[in-house]
Amino acid sequence: MTSPLPRTRERRPVPRAERALAWVLRVNGAVTVTALLAVFMPVGWMGAVHARLGLGAAPDGPMFEYLARTVSALYAIHGGLCFVLSTDVRRFGPVITYVACAELAFAAALLLIDVKAGMPAAWVMVEAPAVVFVSGLMLGLRIVARRRERDATSD
C-alpha cells in the first residue's frame, strides 16, 4: 500500500568536509566584509592608519582616497559572496572552486605587488601567505567534499 502523502526527499547528513568548508567561507567572509568600514572611514583616519603602518604620510589627492575606498568595497563584496556561498556548499561548489583558484592567483599577484611597492616585510610575509592558506584550505575541502559526494552517489 502506498502512502497518500507526497514523498519527501531524504535528508542526508552533511559531510564533515562540507561543514568545515562552510565555516571557512563564513570566517573568510566575516574578515573581509569588515573592509566595509574603510569605505566610510574619514580620510584623516586613512592617513593615520597609513602612517601607523610605517608607510609615511598618505599621498594627497583624490587617487589615494578613490583606491582605498574602491578596494575596500571590493573586499566587502567578496566577504558577502563568501557568506552566500557558505549557505549551500554543494550547490555552489563550482563557484567555490573558481573563487579558491582565483584567490590563489590573486595571492601570487599580491606578493609581487607588495614586494614591488616596497611594503613592510611583515606585511609581505603575512598578506599573500594568509590568502594562500585560506584559499588552499577552501580548495582542499572542496576537493574532499566533492570526492565524498561522488563516492556516496556511486554506492
Predicted regions and their residues:
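Hydrophobic alpha-helical membrane segments
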Residues: 96-111, 130-135
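Hydrophobic transmembrane helix segments
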Residues: 31-66, 72
